[in-house]
């Protein structure tokens, strides 16, 4: 394999750029994964509130639960951009479900991009290793 000095320099630059981009995408993926998990928990909570009767244990954070009978049929729901509104359980469920679907798509897209960039970085690394540069 005969590569010019410029070709090698471009490969090194692309390899570094890919690694930087991968680090950024992996951080985004971690954030989106947390949001998906949080939305799944919220959706389960709204569905639990929709079911009738009895005392409930509700997670309030840090592994702490509070018990009680919940008679309210509305929940304070984030609408985006820092705005909240009291919504009936049906609409709250719909909004949380839509957000969960959106973030799940973003997560899948990030995973696909990470996979493609990882493959390209591996190809470049193999070329650089054959040239004795990595």
Swiss-Prot record:
GO terms for molecular function: unfolded protein binding. GO terms for biological process: protein folding. Keywords: Chaperone, Cytoplasm. Gene3D superfamilies: 1.10.287.370. Pfam families: Prefoldin. It comes from the Archaea. It is found in: Cytoplasm. One of its GO terms (cellular component) is prefoldin complex. Signal peptide: none annotated. Molecular chaperone capable of stabilizing a range of proteins. Seems to fulfill an ATP-independent, HSP70-like function in archaeal de novo protein folding. Belongs to the prefoldin subunit alpha family. Heterohexamer of two alpha and four beta subunits. This is Prefoldin subunit alpha. It comes from Pyrobaculum calidifontis (strain DSM 21063 / JCM 11548 / VA1). The lineage of its organism: Archaea, Thermoproteota, Thermoprotei, Thermoproteales, Thermoproteaceae.
């Amino acid at each position: 394999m005969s590569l010019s000095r410029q070709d090698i320099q471009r490969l090194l630059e692309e390899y570094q750029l890919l690694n930087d981009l991968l680090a950024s995408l992996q951080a985004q993926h971690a954030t989106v994964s947390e949001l998906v998990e949080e939305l799944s928990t919220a959706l389960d909570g709204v569905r639990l509130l929709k079911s009738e009767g009895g005392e409930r244990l509700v997670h309030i954070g840090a592994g702490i639960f509070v018990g009680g009978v919940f008679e309210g049929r509305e929940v304070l729901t984030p609408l985006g951009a820092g705005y909240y509104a009291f919504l009936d359980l049906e609409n709250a469920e719909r909004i949380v479900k839509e957000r969960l679907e959106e973030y799940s798509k973003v997560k899948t897209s990030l995973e696909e991009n990470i996979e493609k960039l990882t493959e390209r970085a591996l190809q470049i690394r193999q070329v650089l290793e054959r040239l004795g540069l990595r």
